Amino acid sequence: MAKYSSKINKIRTFALSLVFVGFIIMYIGIFFKESVLLSSLFMILGLLSIGLSTVVYFWIGMLSTKAVRVICPGCDKETKVLGVVDMCMHCREPLTLDKGLEGKEFDESYNKKKMSK
């Protein structure tokens, strides 16, 4: 079985990686001190990456406030569920809001909307 984590944590990790990528891009710009154009370009690209991470953090914060809070049966801690199926943030227990999916193997494809005929 593949390693899963909660959707909120995945998006937060992506936003954090954007911050570090932005710093690395800006650091690369230091090596081009002789060329003002290249140095400025790398600094602006790094700043855009950090700005994008701020937007992602804001978006996941808004999304997190709308997430359904449930008590995980595995660890008895409160966690948030985005979509029909998700993982517990604390113990990675598969969670579902759909009674028809209880007992089935965890699959993130259950969150995708099915095409209606």
UniProtKB/Swiss-Prot annotation:
Compartments reported by the entry: Cell membrane
Keyword line: Cell membrane, Membrane, Transmembrane, Transmembrane helix
Origin: domain of life: Bacteria
Spans traversing the lipid bilayer: 13-33, 41-61
Entry membrane topology: Multi-pass membrane protein
Pfam families the record matches: DUF2614
A Gene Ontology cellular-component term: plasma membrane
UniProt xrefs under InterPro entries: UPF0295
Family label: Belongs to the UPF0295 family.
Protein name according to UniProt: UPF0295 protein YgzB
Source organism per UniProt: Bacillus subtilis (strain 168)
